[in-house]
Design a protein with these regions (language model features):
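Hydrophobic "anchor" residues on beta-strands that sit immediately upstream
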Residues: 27, 41, 61, 249-250
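Conserved nucleotide-sensing/catalytic segment adjacent to the nucleotide-binding pocket
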Residues: 14-36, 41-43, 265
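Hydrophobic positions in the central parallel beta-sheet of the AAA+
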Residues: 64, 250-251, 278
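Walker B catalytic acidic pair
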Residues: 253-255
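Single conserved hydrophobic/aromatic residue that forms the stacking wall/gate
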Residues: 1-8, 12-13
Length: 308
């Protein structure tokens, strides 16, 4: 159960929001604010948190926006972002490894730029390489398991969504295999120095989607790509349920207007037991008579009013 409260004009001025989360009968207060200098702060039951990992498990959320419908056809960075966001929500160990990997990759890239002026520092690359391999290998391993888990769920969901016409499979395409990681870094060293960036590692991974054996990222229609994206988000919900034994909150951000009536119906019929927050224009067109609505808020010219 979730309720959101804008606490008086003071909170609005400070760009703050207070949220109450209830899980298994235990209520937790979360305060979030954005300061004038754009820095963010979060406190749980009055205690300021120091790192994002402290939020893990507090409230599992699946966010679905129009941009997600393009995840299949867009660049690999968006597909990596989807996988990373999901795994960071479910696995604190993955979050730890990803954060450290990114920091080390940035440090290595800085060194690669410095080598232009200080070529004598070239031998220090191996220090960063060993750490990159250590943390990067754990990322690759976890991504492989994640894709296997997702494939077990997405198969049946996509078959139903496509009217039994398609079988969908996600294929993980690591930039480098773990056993070759260190050697690949050494082999790419001259190239990395020239380009001043690390060109080998899981930060260059990709994921492909195959419907009936056809790579729909390259050869699929927009309809196929959108159906696969919807299957992916619905599978994300089921995977969170399976791993955490808890139902996530679903946030639908103006995504219904981007779906045809069949996909709208499939989505709304599939979220009947999930607490959902929907933002959309034309509420009557998309939602009325399809889902049970508990609370409706209308935003007009920056003013929020409750309609029920």
């Amino acid at each position: 159960e979730i309720a959101q409260c804008l606490v008086g004009s003071e909170m609005c001025i400070r760009d703050s929001i207070r949220t109450y989360l209830e899980k298994e009968g235990v209520e937790t207060r979360v305060d979030m604010h954005l300061r004038k200098n754009k820095s963010k702060g979060i406190a749980i039951d009055g205690t300021k948190i120091k790192k994002a990992a402290d939020l893990l498990g507090l409230c599992n959320v699946v966010f679905f926006s129009p941009e997600d419908l393009s995840i299949i056809k867009n660049g690999p960075a968006e597909r990596r972002r989807f996988v990373d966001m999901e795994l960071c929500q479910l696995d604190s160990f993955y979050l730890y490894n990803l954060n450290h990997y990114n920091k080390i990759a940035n440090q290595r890239n800085k060194l690669l730029k410095d080598l232009y002026f200080r070529p004598d520092l070239k031998d220090t690359l191996m220090i960063w390489d060993s750490q990159l391999v250590s943390f990067g290998s754990k990322i690759i391993e976890r991504r492989k398991v994640f894709v296997e888990q997702l494939n077990e769920i997405i198969y049946n969901i996509h078959k139903r969504l496509s009217g039994d016409k398609e079988e969908l499979k996600i294929v993980y395409e690591p930039d480098v295999e773990i056993e070759n990681f260190e050697a690949a870094l050494r082999a790419a060293q001259d190239k990395d120095i020239k380009l001043k960036q690390t060109t080998v590692g899981p930060h260059r991974d990709d994921f492909s989607f195959y419907a009936n054996g056809i790579d729909i990222r390259r050869f699929g229609s927009q309809g196929q790509q959108r159906t696969a994206a919807l299957s992916l988000k619905l599978s994300e919900i089921e995977l969170i349920k399976k791993i955490t034994k808890d139902t996530p909150i679903l946030l639908l951000d103006d995504v219904l207007s981007e779906l045809d009536s069949n996909r709208q119906n499939f989505l709304l019929n599939g979220i009947g037991d999930i607490q959902t927050i929907i933002t959309c224009t034309g509420l009557e067109e998309f939602v009325n008579n399809r889902v049970e609505m508990n609370k409706i808020f209308k935003v007009s010219n920056g003013v929020v009013t409750s309609e029920n």
